[in-house]
Amino acid sequence: MQIFVKTLTGKTITLEVEGSDNIENVKAKIQDKEGIPPDQQRLIFAGKQLEDGRTLSDYNIQKESTLHLVLRLRGGMQIFVKTLTGKTITLEVEGSDNIENVKAKIQDKEGIPPDQQRLIFAGKQLEDGRTLSDYNIQKESTLHLVLRLRGGMQIFVKTLTGKTITLEVEGSDNIENVKAKIQDKEGIPPDQQRLIFAGKQLEDGRTLSDYNIQKESTLHLVLRLRGGMQIFVKTLTGKTITLEVEGSDNIENVKAKIQDKEGIPPDQQRLIFAGKQLEDGRTLSDYNIQKESTLHLVLRLRGGN
């Protein structure tokens, strides 16, 4: 049967083969036609590198199938580059290649400009002027590719378990966008996420710039447990504050949340519900405060009763 072999230069070679031919035989035929030694040939079909001892039939290669020929440079090696989408790119490199070269190869394969690429290995960001050998990157090492958005920046999100997530964002991203990025990375639904920065809970409709969140700022992620609820707190000025709470939260917790939002110290807060002043040690459930209940906040003046 006839099969085709396409090179990286775009040239297509036609070969006469049998299904029972092994990959070594095919490489020998390519050497006959093109003069490329078998040990410099890598053949790819359906995204898989073909092994010398296997046959065309083993890989279900049939008539008029197209194989791709990649040259293995003398002294060269293969490395892998994994993107945030989970895609893995295979590159042919030399230990002496610098990081700029590697980014150029990624651009050739994926069309991503080098100035938008950040490469990470063993937790370190790789610098353009250094070589793969400088970082002890060896054959079949995996690098991680993070895209640097134009005008974008990196921020960190720390969870209660101590894990830190790195996100690529823009100052103009709103908090909903950030929660969506966290969902993409961690699988946590946005409605279960509460993001805290500088002691304040971030509101969905506001942007990172609104909160003066800059590059390498750290946000804190608190999970809103299912079974949580929203309540409202109305001040004497008529302002209404929305709080995320649990029925098991005690009144002290609620006052702390109000302090986070409004900056009012707990000892200056008096909370009223259904005509009763709420006591610190009791819980919302004790007072039968349910979702969307409204509490009234009265300020206790310093020195007052």
From Swiss-Prot:
Primary subcellular site in the record, as a coarse category: cytoplasm
UniProt crosslink position (Glycyl lysine isopeptide (Lys-Gly) (interchain with G-Cter in ubiquitin)): K48
The keyword Cytoplasm belongs to this UniProt entry's keyword annotation: yes
Any one GO molecular-function label of the UniProt entry: ubiquitin protein ligase binding
Per UniProt, location of the Glycyl lysine isopeptide (Gly-Lys) (interchain with K-? in acceptor proteins) cross-link in this chain: G76
Compartments (UniProt record): Cytoplasm; Nucleus
Segments forming domain Ubiquitin-like: 1-76, 77-152, 153-228, 229-304
CDD domains linked to this entry: Ubl_ubiquitin
A GO CC term attached to the entry: cytoplasm
Residue ranges annotated as propeptide in the record: 305
One record GO biological process: modification-dependent protein catabolic process
Pfam family of the protein (one): ubiquitin
Keyword check for Repeat: yes
Matching SMART domains: UBQ
Keywords from the UniProt entry: Cytoplasm, Isopeptide bond, Nucleus, Repeat, Ubl conjugation
Role: Ubiquitin exists either covalently attached to another protein, or free (unanchored). When covalently bound, it is conjugated to target proteins via an isopeptide bond either as a monomer (monoubiquitin), a polymer linked via different Lys residues of the ubiquitin (polyubiquitin chains) or a linear polymer linked via the initiator Met of the ubiquitin (linear polyubiquitin chains). Polyubiquitin chains, when attached to a target protein, have different functions depending on the Lys residue of the ubiquitin that is linked: Lys-48-linked is involved in protein degradation via the proteasome.
General remark: Ubiquitin is synthesized as a polyubiquitin precursor with exact head to tail repeats. Some ubiquitin genes contain a single copy of ubiquitin fused to a ribosomal protein. In D.discoideum there are 9 genes: ubqA: 5 copies of Ub and a final Asn; ubqB: 1 copy of Ub and ribosomal protein eL40; ubqC: 1 copy of Ub and ribosomal protein eS31; ubqD: 3 copies of Ub and a final Leu; ubqF: 7 copies of Ub and a final Asn; ubqG: 5 copies of Ub and a final Leu; ubqH: 5 copies of Ub and a final Asn; ubqI: 4 copies of Ub and a final Asn; ubqJ: 4 copies of Ub and a final Asn. For the sake of clarity sequence features are annotated only for the first chain, and are not repeated for each of the following chains.
Similarity comment text for this entry: Belongs to the ubiquitin family.
UniProt protein name: Polyubiquitin-I
Organism of provenance: Dictyostelium discoideum
Gene name in the database record: ubqI
